[in-house]
């Protein structure tokens, strides 16, 4: 009779699972409720206490107050709409495409799995997944037909860092397109993953990246607008010494403080996000470049080349097509798409450059990456041969010393 530990039994009890699910739901719901509440309160403070109570004192200022109220209300609607547009669109995942799903993940663990990719220099590839196959009782793994990425739908340029095989996810059982990463929080792979945002309780990826950038821009503009309006009201209130016979609503004071804080923080993050858009780079790729830079200083990175004068320079980003093309590839082809939260993506498997599976690249930079990868492979092979030769010479010398005759 198998007796489980009490802690294990309690942890897997149905009521414990229900409590965990409820707590996760609350944690996911909190940022949405908090953001909506704060944003709605701000527009209330702006229109009611700022425009109606303070500015609508004479006929001349009434028109000005109405204009301020309409501008603030428009920015409020755009901020709220883009926020929920990010949630509704979602980041996108390879799991959404039947063609990218792997029928049998063990077929990729075959010792004779060959991949026809530009970096592949080895015919055979031993992986740890074959051990997993034996552990699960798959004795005849050679009889499993090896799967290959669907080349008719997906053109790959990024490979696994530890070998020359195409990237795939063992948790989601899908092929991973370029710039795709697995999110441990969402527990799924995300197309062109930028980052996981706690304020959305969701990842920012290919399908909602544009709306996320617009959300940051709208929120920065709205915060700056509230800050200017509340500052002017407070300045006039104290400059004209109205505090002697008038009361000032604390809502305007709180609006001034919060709008200033949001304008600085969100504005800084918005500037950083727009910089990445113009460079066609995700937050993950930006962070990877920082790690590579640190490794480069320690002599552990080879993502550079030497020019004619012998100076070292970086290879560059294969997805960087120039500021204009980078911007249009994410935000849309014209100013109409740039200003309004209009969808520019396509969730069809046949939409080559609009579904998050394929991306335009700088062919010249990509060729240099391939050439550099081949040189690295040759250097690694020469180093391995040298170490093997030294080891054999040492073993031969030891044999000679132990047997002089």
From Swiss-Prot:
Main localization of the protein described in the UniProt heading: membrane
Key words, A-Z: Acyltransferase, Lipoprotein, Membrane, Palmitate, Transferase, Transmembrane, Transmembrane helix, Vacuole
Keyword Acyltransferase carried by entry: yes
Membrane-spanning segments: 28-48, 63-83, 215-235, 252-272
Catalyzed reactions per annotation: L-cysteinyl-[protein] + hexadecanoyl-CoA = S-hexadecanoyl-L-cysteinyl-[protein] + CoA
Posttranslational mods: Autopalmitoylated.
Enzyme Commission number: 2.3.1.225
Topological domains annotated Lumenal: 49-62, 236-251
PROSITE patterns, per the entry: DHHC
Cellular localization per UniProt: Vacuole membrane
Membrane topology annotation: Multi-pass membrane protein
Superkingdom assignment: Eukaryota
InterPro entries, sorted: Palmitoyltrfase_DHHC, PFA4/ZDH16/20/ERF2-like
A GO molecular-function descriptor: protein-cysteine S-palmitoyltransferase activity
Domain DHHC: start-end pairs: 167-217
Annotated Gene Ontology cellular component terms: vacuolar membrane
Topology, Cytoplasmic side: 1-27, 84-214, 273-405
Family designation: Belongs to the DHHC palmitoyltransferase family. PFA3 subfamily.
Domain remarks in the Swiss-Prot or TrEMBL record: The DHHC domain is required for palmitoyltransferase activity.
Biological function: Palmitoyltransferase specific for VAC8. Palmitoylates VAC8 at one or more of its N-terminal cysteine residues, which is required for its proper membrane localization.
Protein name per UniProt: Palmitoyltransferase PFA3
Lineage, uppermost ranks: Eukaryota, Fungi, Dikarya, Ascomycota, Saccharomycotina
Gene: PFA3
